[in-house]
Amino acid sequence: MDTAKWPQEFVVKPMNEIVTNTCLKQQSNPPSPATPVERKARPEKDQALNCPRCNSLNTKFCYYNNYSLTQPRYFCKDCRRYWTAGGSLRNIPVGGGVRKNKRSSSNSSSSSPSSSSSSKKPLFANNNTPTPPLPHLNPKIGEAAATKVQDLTFSQGFGNAHEVKDLNLAFSQGFGIGHNHHSSIPEFLQVVPSSSMKNNPLVSTSSSLELLGISSSSASSNSRPAFMSYPNVHDSSVYTASGFGLSYPQFQEFMRPALGFSLDGGDPLRQEEGSSGTNNGRPLLPFESLLKLPVSSSSTNSGGNGNLKENNDEHSDHEHEKEEGEADQSVGFWSGMLSAGASAAASGGSWQ
């Protein structure tokens, strides 16, 4: 078709004609009633079917199996079983009855493992069970074991208690060594019974003084304490009794007192063995460094002239008087021995 012929075939109609034509068509053709949608209703059975198991008429239609019209499914209310028309019968119960049976069976199965587990031995031991008593918790066993260990120790080290005494060791006199473990406690550490302390109130004070080496009679008088004194170091029997002889030079340094200050009487090794033991070996504390001794310039400048020496002497006398005045106000120092004895009084110790 050519494009030149288009205006001739398609004629534009006026608007009024279009409106009038549509109105006339609506009046001539009344609206037809709406047709209902056709549904395929479920086929209702006029009469109930007999149950293939119990021949009961108490049955009902349930649904179509697999949405197929050829497999209607029914349910029997008496035997509570389902069946499908055209299908095979199954003896497996379906529905609520099966669920009830499953619940009862599950309860019975859960109770049986619990009973079997209770009858078996538990895998882990209970922590609350009391542990058997250990031997070291029993005091009798502990004392017997301590006694055996002590006897074994002394028997291995020394062989016998008599051998220890024969060695004349320093601890053989202070500590009792025997088979009884109570005898190894030093006598000055033994506790005084409370009954004796109640009866005699002076027992506690006397025992404490005896611990320090001070007797009750000497404590009343102003005597020096026993623990401040040292044994007579001039006597050579102290060293020979301990198993060390003066003839052994390797023990000479060991026998020297390892103190930071000197003892009264000097070195015992340098004295003669036959010297009388009048000195008690009291310690001398290093108070010499605390004393303020005036230093005169005359000792340093011995070669100076006479005028300078006289001036220095006057200056030193003035400083000495000043120091004596200050010493009267301050605490004095004892230049002698720590404990005043007969030898100390003879040596001329005095307060400064």
Swiss-Prot record:
Keyword DNA-binding: yes
Region entry Disordered, spans: 24-46, 93-136, 265-334
Residue spans of biased composition, Low complexity class: 104-129
Localization terms from the record: Nucleus
Record's compositionally biased regions (Basic and acidic residues): 37-46, 310-323
Single GO BP term: regulation of DNA-templated transcription
Span of zinc fingers (Dof-type): 49-103
Leader sequence residues: none
MF GO annotations: DNA-binding transcription factor activity; transcription cis-regulatory region binding; zinc ion binding
Keywords: DNA-binding, Metal-binding, Nucleus, Transcription, Transcription regulation, Zinc, Zinc-finger
Protein task: Transcription factor that binds specifically to a 5'-AA[AG]G-3' consensus core sequence.
Protein name, entry field: Dof zinc finger protein DOF1.8
Source organism of this protein record: Arabidopsis thaliana
Lineage: Eukaryota, Viridiplantae, Streptophyta, Embryophyta, Tracheophyta
